[in-house]
């Protein structure tokens, strides 16, 4: 099941349908695009995202996000007021951006939506959906199936492909860079392929074949940014399109996926704490679905299938962490579940994959990555500790029962291929050029003791030959929400910073998911301040152990990570010199008080219900960044916001910026002459949205800001980036 499991595990912690074998299988909350699974470096106008079979692994699924957009024209006066002109020495960064934009694509790690089915590979080439014979996939000998420009969209790209079992049809989900709306097109495959149908606002979708060899497409539909309806459709001479299921509870969302063996189509109904799964027989898709287990509050579960048995990843029982259970497919209810495999305490289940004779679990324990290979014939377990430099998995979809391929990466190291071969019982790594970063940098796993004594893990990177680390600049990363891990995928600009002498620190605070479900529970609702205490402890510990100093320390956060970063700026502004925030969630109270937003109900499990619970309201007031702005000294802050962001209210970011500038002005007035006012920059990107790809302009602007605020020479940055581009 591979990336689908990863999707599921993240979906359990945040609301809307996120990460997996394809964008639709992701489940995102209001304020986080998690991750899109992997870092995608956009070089031209097309998104190229690479997978290996008929279950592509890419980014997000249901965009069940409330639209809170404001026109660029309306915001222009505010933008002009809050933005400061770029410094004259911006030339070096302009060169960097120009170099990035003109660099040939082949010099980058490109990820492309690519699906193998039968003897063909289906993928995007330019602005077309194409296919080629498997052995010819690396050349230009391909067949054009559909031109995306027929949809008359601005810069369209494919983020998911599904091929019908007998290859009579292919379905592709298409969206644009500037919008989260998507269209699913159905292409009839023949000597002259033709678009037979298109459906708007499709989230997840899967093909099955019925008893009469007719292809049936099941798909979920979003209405008012909520994914509650399941449809099934047929094509050709027997066309029909009917609603199959509707979820009535607005706090739940629905998504679909096939078990890896394609035996069952699963309908997954879930919110942050509870799930329910129905099975549709892949051989009899018109039969009524079968319920696995009726939803029980607090019980989460995910289902896979092999040899007439269901394998269920669930948190039922004690401890309330994920464990693997098993039952016969014809007796699926919870009373029949037998414990099959248990994880150690404080272990995060990252992914799970089923093979003919093996089950493979990808885990994180003590801030290190492991692979556990379970022999299904004899219940044997082989645990492999992965290289200590690795911080993230990238799963390859794979139908080969003999091998389990995957990639490992870190923020400063591009993905490297590994394959576990079941017959040999060994892990093999890709041979070839060894990345020089392995010798020129160090990765450290440290811990900080929080206010209540809890040990908080940190991952730290720096150059091997760095001397006097106390005088080096430090960039601290934080997230701490929705049970999601802090993103540690490869980022070229992070590598550039390390090459230029920076220290990178990733603080895995409570509220995230690095140590399992309990780690998340200890940092949400009325325990949110634990995450803030953890962040403060991490920064103080780093300084205490000789890593940088407050005047050279910077902090960065994205989306919901802005809550803790913004709270730190209010509570301990002296710890950092500068902060960069991207699409930050900064006004928790007013957003959660607005019950007219379609997804507020889904967010209550994370932030609480301030509208009806006075305890929740008062607690949110204690840490909400917007509510706690006061006249005092603040670090300089660079905020990147997107005009068409459908997850974080742009109006709230503008209000936060205005209130912050007023507080700083009042403090400056009280302090008198000689006070150095911090720079507060609001960069509103027109035409973007919460899931927009990293643009070179944005990256260089953020790097420029950090260097300027710390008074550092930026000359070497361009040289380091040129070295990276030759990779």
Curated annotation (Swiss-Prot):
Keywords, sorted A to Z: Acetylation, Congenital myasthenic syndrome, Cytoplasm, Cytoskeleton, Disease variant, Golgi apparatus, Hydrolase, Nucleus, Protease, Serine protease
Annotated GO MF terms: peptidase activity; serine-type endopeptidase activity
Keyword Calcium: no
Pfam family, one: Peptidase_S9_N
Regulation: Inhibited by PMSF and Prefabloc, as well as leupeptin at high concentrations. Partially inhibited by TPCK, a chymotrypsin inhibitor and E64, a cysteine protease inhibitor. Not affected by 4-amidinophenyl-methanesulfonyl fluoride (APMSF), pepstatin or EDTA. Inhibited by 1-isobutyl-3-oxo-3,5,6,7-tetrahydro-2H-cyclopenta[c]pyridine-4-carbonitrile.
Tissue specificity remark: Expressed in pyramidal neurons of the temporal cortex and neocortex (at protein level). Widely expressed. Expressed at higher level in brain, skeletal muscle, heart and kidney. Expressed at the endplates in the neuromuscular junction.
Keyword Acetylation: yes
Active-site residues, record numbering mapped to chain: 559 (charge relay system), 645 (charge relay system), 690 (charge relay system)
Quaternary structure and partners: Homodimer. Interacts with the AP-1 complex.
Role according to the record: Serine peptidase whose precise substrate specificity remains unclear. Does not cleave peptides after a arginine or lysine residue. Regulates trans-Golgi network morphology and sorting by regulating the membrane binding of the AP-1 complex. May play a role in the regulation of synaptic vesicle exocytosis.
Entry's disease: Hypotonia-cystinuria syndrome: Characterized generalized hypotonia at birth, nephrolithiasis, growth hormone deficiency, minor facial dysmorphism, failure to thrive, followed by hyperphagia and rapid weight gain in late childhood.
PANTHER family found in the cross-reference section: PROLYL ENDOPEPTIDASE-LIKE, PROTEASE FAMILY S9A OLIGOPEPTIDASE
Name of protein: Prolyl endopeptidase-like
Organism in which the protein naturally occurs: Homo sapiens (Human)
């Amino acid at each position: 099941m591979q990336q689908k499991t990863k999707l599921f595990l993240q979906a359990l912690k945040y609301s809307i349908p996120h990460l997996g074998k394809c964008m639709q299988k992701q489940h995102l909350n209001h304020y986080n695009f998690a991750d899109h699974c992997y870092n995608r470096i956009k070089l031209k106008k097309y998104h190229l995202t690479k997978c290996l079979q008929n279950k592509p692994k890419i980014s997000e699924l249901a965009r069940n996000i409330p639209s809170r957009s404001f026109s660029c024209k309306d915001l222009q006066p505010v933008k002009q007021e809050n933005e400061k002109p770029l410094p004259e020495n911006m030339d070096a960064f302009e060169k960097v951006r120009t170099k990035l934009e003109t660099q040939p694509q082949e010099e980058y790690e490109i990820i492309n939506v690519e699906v193998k089915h039968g003897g063909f590979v289906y993928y995007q080439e330019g602005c077309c959906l194409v296919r080629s014979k498997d052995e010819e996939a690396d050349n230009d000998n391909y067949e054009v199936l559909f031109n995306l420009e027929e949809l008359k969209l601005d810069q369209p790209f494919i983020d998911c492909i599904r091929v019908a079992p007998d290859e009579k049809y292919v379905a592709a989900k298409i969206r644009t860079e500037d919008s989260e709306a998507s269209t699913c097109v159905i292409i009839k495959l023949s000597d002259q392929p033709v678009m037979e149908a298109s459906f708007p606002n499709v989230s997840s979708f899967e093909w099955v074949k019925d008893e009469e060899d007719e292809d049936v497409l099941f798909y979920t539909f979003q209405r008012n940014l909520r994914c509650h309806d399941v449809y099934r459709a047929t094509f050709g001479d027997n066309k029909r399109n009917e609603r199959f299921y509707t979820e009535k509870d607005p706090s739940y969302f629905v998504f679909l996926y096939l078990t890896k063996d394609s035996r069952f189509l699963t309908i997954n109904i879930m919110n942050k704490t509870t799930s329910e799964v129905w099975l549709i027989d892949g051989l009899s898709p018109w039969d009524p679905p079968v319920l696995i287990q009726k939803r029980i509050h607090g019980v989460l579960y995910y289902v896979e299938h092999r040899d007439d048995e269901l394998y269920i990843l669930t948190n039922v029982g004690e401890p309330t962490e994920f464990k693997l259970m098993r039952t016969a497919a014809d007796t699926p209810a919870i009373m029949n579940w037998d414990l099959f495999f248990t994880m150690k305490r404080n272990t995060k289940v990252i992914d799970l994959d089923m093979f003919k004779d093996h089950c493979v679990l990808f885990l994180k324990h003590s801030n290190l990555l492991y692979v556990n290979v379970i022999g299904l014939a004899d219940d044997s377990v082989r645990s492999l500790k992965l290289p200590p430099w690795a911080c993230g998995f990238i799963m390859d979809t794979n139908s080969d029962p003999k091998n389990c391929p995957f990639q490992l990466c870190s923020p400063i190291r591009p993905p490297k291929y590994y394959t576990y071969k079941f017959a040999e019982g060994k892990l093999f790594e890709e041979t070839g050029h060894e990345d020089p970063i392995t010798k020129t940098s160090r990765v450290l796993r440290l811990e900080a003791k929080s206010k209540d004594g809890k040990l908080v893990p940190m991952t730290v990177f720096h150059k091997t030959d760095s001397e006097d680390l106390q005088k080096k600049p430090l960039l601290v990363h934080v997230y701490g929400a929705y049970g999601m891990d802090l993103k540690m995928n490869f980022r070229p600009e992070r590598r550039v910073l390390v090459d230029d002498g920076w220290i990178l620190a990733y603080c895995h605070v409570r509220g995230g998911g690095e140590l399992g479900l309990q780690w998340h529970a200890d940092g949400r609702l009325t325990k949110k301040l634990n995450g803030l205490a953890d962040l403060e402890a991490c920064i103080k510990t780093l300084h205490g152990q000789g890593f940088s100093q407050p005047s050279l320390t910077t902090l960065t956060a994205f989306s919901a990570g802005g809550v803790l970063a913004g709270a730190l700026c209010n509570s301990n502004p002296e710890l950092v010199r500068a902060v960069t925030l991207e699409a930050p969630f900064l006004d928790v109270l007013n957003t959660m008080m607005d019950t007219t937003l379609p997804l507020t109900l889904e967010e209550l499990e994370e932030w609480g219900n301030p509208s009806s619970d006075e305890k929740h309201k008062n607690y949110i007031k204690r840490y909400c960044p917007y509510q706690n702005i006061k006249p005092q000294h603040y670090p300089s802050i660079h905020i990147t916001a997107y005009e068409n962001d459908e997850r974080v209210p742009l109006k709230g970011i503008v209000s936060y910026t205005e209130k912050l500038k007023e507080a700083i002005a009042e403090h400056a007035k009280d302090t008198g002459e000689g006070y150095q006012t911090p720079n507060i920059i609001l960069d509103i990107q027109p035409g973007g949205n919460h899931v927009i790809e990293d643009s070179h302009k944005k990256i260089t602007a953020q790097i420029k800001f950090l260097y300027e605020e710390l008074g550092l020479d930026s000359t070497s940055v361009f040289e380091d980036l040129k070295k990276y581009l030759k990779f």
